[in-house]
Amino acid sequence: MLFPTEFDVIVVGGGHAGTEAALASARMGAKTLLLTHNIETLGQMSCNPSIGGIGKGHLVKEVDALGGAMAAATDESGIQFRILNSSKGPAVRATRAQADRILYKAAIRHRLENQPNLWLFQQAVDDLMVEGDRVVGAVTQIGIRFRARAVVLTAGTFLDGKIHVGLNNYTGGRAGDPAAVSLSSRLKELKLPQGRLKTGTPPRIDGRTIDFSKLDEQPGDLDPIPVFSFLGRAEQHPQQLPCWVTHTNERTHDIIRGGLDRSPMYTGVIEGVGPRYCPSIEDKIHRFASKESHQIFLEPEGLTTHEFYPNGISTSLPFDVQLELVHSMRGLENAHILRPGYAIEYDYFDPRALKASLETKAINGLFFAGQINGTTGYEEAAAQGLLAGLNAGRYVQEKDAWCPRRDQAYLGVLVDDLVTRGVAEPYRMFTSRAEYRLSLREDNADMRLTEIGRELGLVDDARWDAFSRKRDAVSRETERLKSTWVTPKTLPAEEATALLGKAIEHEYSLAELLRRPGVSYDGVCGLKGGECGPAEPLADDPVLLEQIKEQVEIGIKYQGYIERQASEIERNDANENTRLPDGIDYREVRGLSFEVSQKLNEFRPETIGQASRISGVTPAAISLLMVHLKRRGLGRRNGKAAEAAEQGGGAVPTQQ
C-alpha cells in the first residue's frame, strides 16, 4: 500500500497537548503523524474560551519561548487581553486573553497543516502495538496499523469518558464526541496505575437574551494592549470585546440546594474527584455556605456568534435546575440556554509512573501528556505536550531526554510536582507552586528558555534573531546604566527632586537611581533633558523596545533578590542533579525506615532532588541516601547537565 504507515513519532489526540506535541516533534525533524478522531476539532477549546491567567500565563509564555503555537494563536484570535495582578510585583503578573473559538482553532490548524515533517490523519485509535516493554505503533478504529518508535498519548477526557447531566449519564469524550472506550481498556491491560477524575462545564447562553443594561462591564486593557507571544503584535488582534459581570444571590443558592438530591456529585453517581480551583457551582454553595453571592463572568465565545460562556457556574445539575438558577441572576432573567452544562468523568494515569521526560517507566517509547496525567487546563496540557513531543523526537534520535528544572521554568515545576507527588485531584498551575517565582516571571521566559530551545531544535531563525537582538540590547543597556554616573553638579537639584523627591548628595550611577521606589527606566533616561538615555535607540520595533526596557528595569530593581535566589539555587544544585541508579534497592540503604524505602522503591525517583519531594521522605532519609551513594560510589552528577549549566542552559537530561 502506498499510503504511509511508518513514522518516527505518532501523536494520539488533537487537543492542546496533542497539537503542541506534534508540532514540537516535527520541528525536531522527526517524521510525525497526528491521529485525531475529527480533524475539525483540532485545537478545540472544549470549555472556557480563554487562555492564560495566574500561573497559566507563565506556562503559555514558556511554550512560546520554546517555539510553541499557543501564544501566537491567541494573539491572532484574542478578543480581549488583560494583565492580571498588574499592581503587584512582576513575579505574579499574568496575561489572560478571551479568544474567539473559531479563530483559535483556525490558527492552530493552519500551523499544523503547514508544519514540515507532520502528517494529519482522521481516525480514532483503539489499540496500541506493544512488543515486550516497548511501544511500536497504534491501531485505528478501522484497523489501520501505524508503526512508530515513539507514541505520545494525549487523550484528554476521552478515556472511558462519561457525561453527567442530573442523574442521566452517557458515554462521551465531551459533548458531541465519542469516548475512547477501547483504548481505555487496552491501557488498563498494560497494568499502568490509573484512577478516575471529573471536570465540568457551564451551560452556554444566547447573548441576544441577556439584558446587558443590568450588568457591570469589564473591558480589556487598552493602554498598552497586551500581547501573548514574544513575537506578537497588537495589530494581529481581531476586534476587541468586553466581558460582563453578574452575581448569584440567595435565591440562586436556594435553587441549587433544592436540586442537590438530583445532583450526580451529591448522590454518589460521580466517583471521580473534581478540580479544587475550578469547582462546580454546587460545590461552591456547599463549601462556602456563608457566602451570600458569587461573581459570574459572562464571556463572549467569539465575533461570529451570540454565544456566551458564564464563567463560574459549571454544573451537572438537571437541566430544569440549570434553567432556573440561570434565570435567578440579574440580567439573565430571560436568558435562553443554548447548551446544557455537564460534568464528565474520565480515566487518568498516575503520573508518578512517568519519567521527567513524560515517558512511561514501564513501556519504552510511550509518552503521556495533558489530562491523562491528572492535570486540568489548556495551558498545562500545551506545556506537557510540547515537552512530550520534544522528548519523543529525541527518543527516536537516540538523544538524552530534556526537562527543565524547578528553578528554570514553571514547566519544570509542573512536571516535577506530577512525577514526584502525583495527584489526588486535577492539578492546576499557580505562581504559589514555584519556590523560585521571582526568577520565573512571564517577562523573562524567553531569556530562560529560548537559547535552550534553539539548541534542542525547537526555535526557528525568526524567533532566534528577535531573541538575540533583545538579549544583547538588555545586556548592553544594563551595563550602560551601571557605568553612567551623575553628581550633584551635573544633575540639577530641581530635576533630581522631580524624580527622586530630593536633590542627590553625592555621585550615583543611573542603575542606583533606578533601584529607588517609584523610579522608572523612562524617568532615569529622561534626566538632563534626555542626555541620560541611550545614544541610539535600543530597538526599531516598538514591541521589542518595550520588552527590553521592562527586562532592564526589573533586572536592576530586583537585582539583590534575584542574586539571593540564584545563590539558593546553586546550593541546591548538587541534590537536584545527583542521579539515582536505575537498579538500586532502597531496602539495602542502612537506616532508612520501611515506609521510606517502600515509597522510594515504588516511585523510583530519578534524582536526589525528586526523592526529597516525595511525601514522607525526610531530610534525614536524604542524608542517609547520600551517604549510601557515596559509600558505594553510585551517585553521579549528570555530565551533560553540568555542561549545559556552564553554558547557561541549565538543561537536565533525563535517562531514557
Swiss-Prot record:
Family of the protein in this entry: Belongs to the MnmG family.
PANTHER family in alphabetical order: GLUCOSE INHIBITED DIVISION PROTEIN A, PROTEIN MTO1 HOMOLOG, MITOCHONDRIAL
Entry-linked NCBIfam families: mnmG_gidA
Compartments (UniProt record): Cytoplasm
Pfam families in alphabetical order: GIDA, GIDA_C_1st, SAM_GIDA_C
Function: NAD-binding protein involved in the addition of a carboxymethylaminomethyl (cmnm) group at the wobble position (U34) of certain tRNAs, forming tRNA-cmnm(5)s(2)U34.
Residues involved in FAD binding: 13-18
Name of this protein: tRNA uridine 5-carboxymethylaminomethyl modification enzyme MnmG
Organism: Burkholderia orbicola (strain MC0-3)
GO biological process: tRNA methylation; tRNA wobble uridine modification
Disulfide bridges in this chain: none
Gene Ontology CC entries for this record: cytosol
Main location: cytoplasm
Chain segments carrying region Disordered: 636-656
Residues the entry annotates as binding NAD(+): 274-288
Biased composition (Gly residues): 647-656
UniProt KW Transferase keyword: no
Oligomer status and interactors: Homodimer. Heterotetramer of two MnmE and two MnmG subunits.
Required cofactor(s): FAD
Keyword annotations of the record: Cytoplasm, FAD, Flavoprotein, NAD, tRNA processing
